[in-house]
Amino acid sequence: MDVPYDLTSYIRVLKLASTPSWEEFSQIAKIAGAGIALVGLLGFIIFAVMTFVPGSKPV
């Protein structure tokens, strides 16, 4: 493991990185929120279907 090389790589990445604008951050937050809501909705649908299937017990 070459520590000086790794540190220079990290510094180079940090110099290239920039903070997103408010519009970009807002768009990313909306997309991430929609993804989380979609996964939750999918889980709820599976739970609801398994509740009505005979012989299955919801946890």
Swiss-Prot record:
It is a single-pass membrane protein. Gene3D superfamilies: Preprotein translocase SecE subunit. GO terms for cellular component: plasma membrane. Keywords: Cell membrane, Membrane, Protein transport, Translocation, Transmembrane, Transmembrane helix, Transport. GO terms for molecular function: protein transmembrane transporter activity. The chain crosses the membrane at residues 33-53. One of its GO terms (biological process) is protein targeting. It is found in: Cell membrane. InterPro entries: Prot_translocase_SecE_dom_sf, Translocase_Sec61-g, Translocase_SecE/Sec61-g. Belongs to the SecE/SEC61-gamma family. HAMAP family: SecE. Component of the Sec protein translocase complex. Heterotrimer consisting of SecY (alpha), SecG (beta) and SecE (gamma) subunits. The heterotrimers can form oligomers, although 1 heterotrimer is thought to be able to translocate proteins. Interacts with the ribosome. May interact with SecDF, and other proteins may be involved. Essential subunit of the Sec protein translocation channel SecYEG. Clamps together the 2 halves of SecY. May contact the channel plug during translocation. This is Protein translocase subunit SecE. It comes from Haloarcula marismortui (strain ATCC 43049 / DSM 3752 / JCM 8966 / VKM B-1809). The lineage of its organism: Archaea, Methanobacteriati, Methanobacteriota, Stenosarchaea group, Halobacteria.
